[in-house]
Amino acid sequence: MADSASESDTDGAGGNSSSSAAMQSSCSSTSGGGGGGGGGGGGGKSGGIVISPFRLEELTNRLASLQQENKVLKIELETYKLKCKALQEENRDLRKASVTIQARAEQEEEFISNTLFKKIQALQKEKETLAVNYEKEEEFLTNELSRKLMQLQHEKAELEQHLEQEQEFQVNKLMKKIKKLENDTISKQLTLEQLRREKIDLENTLEQEQEALVNRLWKRMDKLEAEKRILQEKLDQPVSAPPSPRDISMEIDSPENMMRHIRFLKNEVERLKKQLRAAQLQHSEKMAQYLEEERHMREENLRLQRKLQREMERREALCRQLSESESSLEMDDERYFNEMSAQGLRPRTVSSPIPYTPSPSSSRPISPGLSYASHTVGFTPPTSLTRAGMSYYNSPGLHVQHMGTSHGITRPSPRRSNSPDKFKRPTPPPSPNTQTPVQPPPPPPPPPMQPTVPSAATSQPTPSQHSAHPSSQP
């Protein structure tokens, strides 16, 4: 491009110089013709062109201006030539630089491609190493998980046995306490009935004694009235009509024996009142003591029932957790087996206790603790030890069958037991009050509360007290 521009500049400069030369020649021819014409005119004016001085001066000026322009154009031509040479040099340098840059770019590209190829090879080696490490880690994790699963199953069986023994002990203890409470309640009810009967007997006895005393007093009053009338007759006094015993007032003087008997009756009434108050106080204290004991027994029974419920909930939560862990392990094993089957039965280590039959061409190590055979292999975990010999939980077993020479193994078929994945509650011993075999019997109802009225229910009169009544009477 620089060469073509320089050539066009040189061509333009040559054209301008040729045009200026043509103009100069034309001007000179015109000036010569003018001179010749002048000469001819001077000679004979035969037919030449007459140029006026003004026109001649104008042409002279024009010629001078054209010469000046020609000089300017020559100077510009020289400058353009210099520029063209500089551009040609610059173009040459740019070509050299482009060649150098292209060679350097090729070298850098080759270096980058070599570096990337080395990195790709290193990544491939690292990938192979990671694959080997992953297989080793997977095999280690599988063996570790199988070992932990077996350990969990053993711990589960031990926990089931321990929990069952503890639950049986708690149930027996609770049943003993319930029977003891029932016996105490029955004995207290019998004691209460006996006290009630004794109270009624004491009330009847007291009423009979009071009636006997009143009758005896009336008889003595009648006797005294008769003696009074006899004395009045002896003293020849007019006998007044005998007053009614109910009209006798305290103002009438009584004999000394009547006063003594009245004092005795008052003392007897005071003594019986004291005995009645003491019996009522003793009865209230015993009833409060019985109520307090019954409240303590109810609280103890409720606390034991709550403790039993917490133990049962903890056992059920533990069973659920164990069953969930086993089911998750089964699902992982089944998914892994399906992936292995889809990939062409590549031999891998499998987690115990699910047996797996590898292909005959397998050369990888097999996880220890697994038994392989060509016939049907089934794993059944140890059943939980129960009191009645029943298995409350059966873990699922996977069976692998031999299908001939075409395939070494088939897809395992998970088979779950029909028994629920929970522990059943142990059957407590039958209670005398209830027939429900699952739940413990409810606490016995409280004895009927008797209104605390002033009575002599708890005081049992001694033979000396009963014998004191006839002996103390005059």
From Swiss-Prot:
The modification N-acetylalanine is found at residue 2. The modification Phosphothreonine is found at residue 349. Residues 106-235 are annotated as: 5 X 29 AA tandem repeats. It is found in: Cytoplasm; Cytoplasm, Cytoskeleton. GO terms for molecular function: identical protein binding; SH3 domain binding; structural constituent of cytoskeleton. Residues 16-30, 351-368, 459-474 have a biased composition (Low complexity). Residues 53-237, 253-332 form a coiled coil. The modification Phosphoserine is found at residues 52, 240, 244, 249, 254, 284, 323, 363, 367, 395, 413. GO terms for cellular component: cytoskeleton; cytosol. Disulfide bonds: none annotated. Residues 1-10 have a biased composition (Acidic residues). Residues 426-451 have a biased composition (Pro residues). Residues 31-47 have a biased composition (Gly residues). Keywords: Acetylation, Chromosomal rearrangement, Coiled coil, Cytoplasm, Cytoskeleton, Methylation, Phosphoprotein, Proto-oncogene, Repeat, SH3-binding. Ubiquitously expressed. The record marks 101-102 as: Breakpoint for translocation to form RET-CCDC6 oncogene. A motif (SH3-binding) lies at residues 442-451. Residues 1-47, 342-369, 397-474 are annotated as: Disordered. Sequence repeats lie at residues 106-134, 135-163, 164-192, 193-206, 207-235. Its main location: cytoplasm. The modification Omega-N-methylarginine is found at residue 387. It is linked to A chromosomal aberration involving CCDC6 is found in papillary thyroid carcinomas (PTCs). Inversion inv(10)(q11.2;q21) generates the RET/CCDC6 (PTC1) oncogene. The protein has mostly an alpha helical conformation similar to myosin heavy-chain tail that might adopt a coiled-coil conformation. This is Coiled-coil domain-containing protein 6. The gene is CCDC6.
